[in-house]
């Protein structure tokens, strides 16, 4: 099999990179493809397809033979059959997010609330407000302490010295299980609904 790659593997500033392969050439025993960094303009996509021989006349079909993302967990949703337009839409939405929102997005993917497709990931990028992040909360003790001491939900002053016997870690574990949240580099994240 002859291999022709017109660009090197390198995820630069894009959110998603895909190696697009000419299916017709592949079936003829030749691997002709190119890395494309997403998001990309329609012209960039068109030029990439032309460079690998997808001209709509001799060769019309392509598939994705490799892919990577700067977003943790995202690559597991991409397959060789993923739609390029859909991936580009996702990358465009992600490019508009701030670094803090990207961090929240990665945690939301890890939580896995109703994300089973690229379409779901696009929807998730548009609905990050349905997740709450508690910065500085990195373990069950911190979570229990936050909800008891800092959230204002409880008035421990009424308990007097009994409040010293409260098991923050155990309470935090229960809260985490109830909320289905996770601890990650930015703190604790949980789904609030929506």
Predicted regions: what they are:
Residues 2-58:
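N-terminal ordered "arm"
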Residues 4, 12-15, 141-194:
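Acidic, proline/glycine-rich low-complexity IDRs
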Residues 21, 27-33, 52, 62, ...:
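Short, glycine-biased loop/turn motifs at secondary-structure junctions and
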Residues 21-27, 67-69, 110-111, 185-194:
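Short, flexible beta-strand-to-coil junctions
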Residues 28, 57-60, 95, 99-102, ...:
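Residue-level signal for secondary-structure boundary elements
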Residues 39-42, 138, 165:
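Conserved aromatic
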Residues 43-116:
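Structured domain cores in non-transmembrane regions
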Residues 99, 105-152, 192-193:
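Extracytoplasmic/secretory-pathway segments with low complexity and glycosylation-like composition
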């Amino acid at each position: 099999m002859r291999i022709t790659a017109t660009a090197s593997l390198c995820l630069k500033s894009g959110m998603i990179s895909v190696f697009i392969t000419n299916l017709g050439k592949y079936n003829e025993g030749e691997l002709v493809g190119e890395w494309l960094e997403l998001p990309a303009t329609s012209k960039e996509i068109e030029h990439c397809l032309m460079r690998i021989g997808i001209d709509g006349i001799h060769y019309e079909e392509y598939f994705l033979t490799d892919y990577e993302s700067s977003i943790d967990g995202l690559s597991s949703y991409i397959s060789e059959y993923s739609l390029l337009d859909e991936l580009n839409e996702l990358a465009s939405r992600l490019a508009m997010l701030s670094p803090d929102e990207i961090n929240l997005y990665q945690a939301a993917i890890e939580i896995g609330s109703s994300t089973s497709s690229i379409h779901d990931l696009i929807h998730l990028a548009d609905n990050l407000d349905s997740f709450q992040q508690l910065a500085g909360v990195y373990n069950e003790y911190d979570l229990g302490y936050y909800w008891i001491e800092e959230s204002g939900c409880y008035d421990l002053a009424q308990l007097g010295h009994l409040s010293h016997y409260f098991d923050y870690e155990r309470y935090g574990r229960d809260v985490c299980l109830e909320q289905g949240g996770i601890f990650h580099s930015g703190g604790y994240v949980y789904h609030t609904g929506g």
